[in-house]
Amino acid sequence: MIELKTLLDLPLHFLHLKQIHCLLLTSPIFYTRRDLFLSRLLRRCCTAATQFRYARRLLCQLQTLSIQLWDSLIGHFSGGITLNRRLSFLAYRHMRRNGVIPSRHTFPPLLKAVFKLRDSNPFQFHAHIVKFGLDSDPFVRNSLISGYSSSGLFDFASRLFDGAEDKDVVTWTAMIDGFVRNGSASEAMVYFVEMKKTGVAANEMTVVSVLKAAGKVEDVRFGRSVHGLYLETGRVKCDVFIGSSLVDMYGKCSCYDDAQKVFDEMPSRNVVTWTALIAGYVQSRCFDKGMLVFEEMLKSDVAPNEKTLSSVLSACAHVGALHRGRRVHCYMIKNSIEINTTAGTTLIDLYVKCGCLEEAILVFERLHEKNVYTWTAMINGFAAHGYARDAFDLFYTMLSSHVSPNEVTFMAVLSACAHGGLVEEGRRLFLSMKGRFNMEPKADHYACMVDLFGRKGLLEEAKALIERMPMEPTNVVWGALFGSCLLHKDYELGKYAASRVIKLQPSHSGRYTLLANLYSESQNWDEVARVRKQMKDQQVVKSPGFSWIEVKGKLCEFIAFDDKKPLESDDLYKTLDTVGVQMRLPDELEDVTAES
């Protein structure tokens, strides 16, 4: 019997488990403790569909288990894969058929399983809880509140919460965490303040949940107050759990110096901590710092997860760091890390922005799963590279794959139509947003249509569309019209569009520069001088733009006519000269062809 108990703890093949089952049924020495061994066997037979069916038959053979063993079985099944969770429901049903009364430990794991599955009915178990008089038990009640709130069923959660006379920290945390999970971060913060007023001390779970809330609404002041409350408990240095949440909160609030300070003071860090710091730098547009932290992470022998890699790839895409992005891609392949939809979409975006359309297509085709963001990234890639018809065709391939477009998808495909001169196709797509997809076009979609009409010289139609807009035209809409007027030398309409843009953005130097360019195109130098004077009178300062360039895997930042002399300046300017030659080459070839 001892040998059999030891045998059941070993990693066994399913066939061996069935052989042990036969032994239990046929050998008389196991008769008195057969149910105990069957329950242990049952824990091992539920990792695949075939084993699930076998496990159901095993359940039916159990007859004399105590409530403690039933609770143990249900708890084991409820925390596993989907099939296991369904097995926990069957175990409960069989337990009741055998006349066993559930305990306060029976329902919390069942509730955890039912709320995770989403397609199951939690109210049936709630009714059983009331039937057996366990609804007033704090342990069971907190599980109900946690389940209802995490599923967004706040009416039911609030009724239980308001009816509870002895609200402990678990009760409060269940509500706070539920609000955070369902996008009501502000409500979570209100509940936290109320909890503090009642004198209930927060635990680590409460602090983590409320820090998430502060990060989501980017309320660094509130986040700092929570940080202060945590320090008041006498914990000078944060553990991994709290520290990672603090780094994440400060990062989302763009306070990357605070995030770095917390990170540096932590005695130990895990992949979540490193990822939070990297994501914070990327969100704050400190892309180079984010990539440097990633390199430090690898040197510290901390293996990145999918979220880490997606953040780093996003940083590479923003600054066009193709070499670094390829290294990350190679790291994923070398370490057999499956490229999920998030990482795949970011990779496509990186290769598209760096001019490597073929590599983007390769990543797209190799993805096992594609969501709307993946399709949109690829459509946008074709559009950005001038393959308007391919972008248009891919959009309809996406629809035939039963993936519904979102607002960004329409932005991408309408932009493709604008760049490809597909006026009628763009017009049909724009009308289909409301007619077929029940989606109200936003100002950015109108801007795409204005750009589409304007590029084809249909300036009056573009202006008429602006006048019919159900919302106030934005600077992007007027900017699209202005660009088209400049292209087709319609200076009168261009002046009107420019005046509307300047009215919306009176402190934006670029708008005045565009208007001055329009006047210089028409050789109206008096108006050019007037615009320059207007900028000076209104103290509009033209801030120099800056760019990044990757040289030998190192990212360099520079502005126009930069006279700084970094160590790598020679390599940097050689690279820029090469880029300049390549940009001029098509025009020079065209001139030679025309002359010949």
UniProtKB/Swiss-Prot annotation:
UniProt keyword annotation of Repeat present: yes
InterPro entries: E_motif, Pentatricopeptide_rpt, PPR_At4g14850-like_plant, TPR-like_helical_dom_sf
UniProt repeat feature PPR, residue ranges: 66-102, 103-136, 137-167, 168-202, 203-237, 239-269, 270-304, 305-339, 340-370, 371-405, 406-436, 442-472
Residue ranges of the region described as Type E motif: 477-552
Keywords: Repeat
A Pfam family: PPR
Keyword Repeat in annotation: yes
GO terms for MF: RNA binding
Type E(+) motif: annotated segments: 553-584
Transmembrane segments: none
BP GO annotations: RNA modification
Similarity field: Belongs to the PPR family. PCMP-E subfamily.
PANTHER family per record: PENTATRICOPEPTIDE REPEAT-CONTAINING PROTEIN
Listed name of the protein: Pentatricopeptide repeat-containing protein At1g50270
Gene this chain is encoded by: PCMP-E42
